[in-house]
Each structure stands twice: as C-alpha cells, then as structure tokens.
Amino acid sequence: MIGWLEALLRVGRKLAAKTVTVQYPEVKPQLPPRSRGRIVLTRDPDGQERCVACNLCAVACPVGCIDLSKAVAEDGRWYPEHFRINFARCIFCGYCEEACPTAAIQLTPDFELSEWRRDALVYDKKDLLIAGEGKVRGYRYWSVAGKAITGKDKGDAEHEAPPVDLKGLRP
C-alpha cells in the first residue's frame, strides 16, 4: 500500500513540474557559442577566398567527407578548383577547422541541414563560400605566409641550439 502511494505522489510532483521540451520550429533553441554546425568557406578582408587547397582538412577528416582538387592561379597562388563536403557523412567534429592554416574553413552554429534526398547534402564550393570573413576577422594569410619574423633567426631563442654548419660536418 505504501509503495502505491509513493508512486502516486511521485507522478503528481512530475505533473506539476515545469516542462523542458522546447517547441522547436516556433521557439528557436539557445545554442552555446562554440556549437559546431554547418561548415562554410570564408574570404579574406580583400574579398579573395582564403582556401589555398593544401588538403589538410581532407586529411584531418576522420570520415573522409571532404573532397577537393588544387588549381594554380596566374599569380602562382593555389586555390581549390572544386571543393565538396558530404554532410550526410560529416560528424561535425571540427578537425577540418583546426587543421586549416588559413582559417578558410569554419563551423557555424547553423544546424538546419535537413533535405529530402541524400544527394542534396553534398555541398559544392558555390554552396559553401560565404561573402564575409566568418569568425576570424582581419586575417590575411598571404601577408604573413613565407616571411621570416624579424629577430627570430635560428639560435636566437632562449635555450635553443645554435644552427648546424652542414659544411663543417664532412668526414
């Protein structure tokens, strides 16, 4: 008898408690600031695409959903000739964003990616490329790439071995 009464009281307390279900289409959920959603390709402050087709994002992807091929522009700069992401396979882990040296590939909080057909979840470069800079503002990869930092020659840092003289190592 007491067990039955305890169960009835427990049900009564749960009925009086506030519900936690969010009515999704009408009420948008509050997402954490670092939530990982849709992947985008960004541009630098000059309006050029940041991606240099280094293929690091495709190598870092644990499920292999990124496919790209490199092309060379007239000025010698690499750019992706085609860039595809299969969102049907993507697990939104963020490894591609971490691997990108130019901050070109970024994950946004947008999570509404449902489609009726799976082939519609394969996004091309034109679908991924956005007009803005994304989360990383003012970063110009080409202004810093390949340039030596002044005062940072080999052997100048604290607790660093002096440079090796290769010609002095002859037998």
From Swiss-Prot:
GO terms for molecular function: 4 iron, 4 sulfur cluster binding; iron ion binding; NADH:ubiquinone reductase (non-electrogenic) activity; quinone binding. Keywords: 4Fe-4S, Cell inner membrane, Cell membrane, Iron, Iron-sulfur, Membrane, Metal-binding, NAD, Quinone, Repeat, Translocase, Ubiquinone. Residues 39-71, 81-110 form the 4Fe-4S ferredoxin-type domain. [4Fe-4S] cluster 2 binds at residues 61, 90, 93, 96. Binds 2 [4Fe-4S] clusters per subunit. It is a peripheral membrane protein. GO terms for biological process: aerobic respiration. Its main location: membrane. Its EC number is 7.1.1.-. Pfam families: Fer4_7 (PF12838). NDH-1 shuttles electrons from NADH, via FMN and iron-sulfur (Fe-S) centers, to quinones in the respiratory chain. The immediate electron acceptor for the enzyme in this species is believed to be ubiquinone. Couples the redox reaction to proton translocation (for every two electrons transferred, four hydrogen ions are translocated across the cytoplasmic membrane), and thus conserves the redox energy in a proton gradient. NDH-1 is composed of 14 different subunits. Subunits NuoA, H, J, K, L, M, N constitute the membrane sector of the complex. Belongs to the complex I 23 kDa subunit family. This is NADH-quinone oxidoreductase subunit I 2.
